[in-house]
Amino acid sequence: MDSGKDTNGYERVWETNCGAMNSGLIMWVISGSGSFSDHYERDPTGGITFTVTNPGTSKRVITVGAFASRPLDTQSFYNAGRIAYFSSRGPTRNGRIKPNIVAGGYFICSTNSEFSSHSDPYICAEGHYYVPFAGTSMATAVVMGLVALYLQDHSFAIPEEVKEWFSSNAVEDDNFLYPNVVYCSEKAVYVLETRFKGSGKTSEQKLRRVTFSYRLAEMGL
């Protein structure tokens, strides 16, 4: 299906996703990367509204956008902490809030292919094993990891419970109103709490909460 087509989420891909969600499978999709959407060029602070496309508009999946989390050059990186320029903005065409969450995705250090000629050992680590990447695909991996950590302690959680877990642990940004259609559920991070078992001193780090916030950007919504 054309990922650049205007949709409200009620397409065949949406039906497939919902079928998977009904069977208990938790699904997440990226919230679009690229310079154009529906012939509109995106601006440096995250594009324009109504640019989340199918399957990101699906009703029950977790749609993930990206924010600028790791500047490569702090002297010239003006977008740190804000929505990434390539990350699509909501809402859907029928007014639903999307994306559901944004996570760090600009830049993220990730593993490098042995066949890749690209490397930057001064940013991530020595050698050619890790390289910086940017994209909503990187942010989606962050959220996927958080969901996996949650499911370790809640093996039988249904998709709605996982989404509620994110929402109930939201930490709002003092400078914005909530909810909104840009950052939506903004910065997804996790906090670890050290707990002790019995009388021993062996500590166990457990996922305590996921924190993210809703933001209202300069669009009057």
From Swiss-Prot:
SUPFAM superfamilies for the chain: Subtilisin-like
**NAD recorded as keyword:** no
Q: What PROSITE patterns does this protein's entry cite?
A: SUBTILASE
Peptidase S8 domain: from which residue to which, for each copy? 1-189
- One Pfam match, by short name? Peptidase_S8
Which keywords appear in this protein's UniProt record, sorted alphabetically?
A: Plasmid
**Family to which this protein belongs:** Belongs to the peptidase S8 family.
- Alphabetized GO MF terms: serine-type endopeptidase activity
One Gene Ontology term of the biological-process aspect is: proteolysis
* Organism annotation: Aquifex aeolicus (strain VF5)
Name of the molecule in the record: Uncharacterized protein aq_aa18
Q: Does the keyword Calcium apply?
A: no
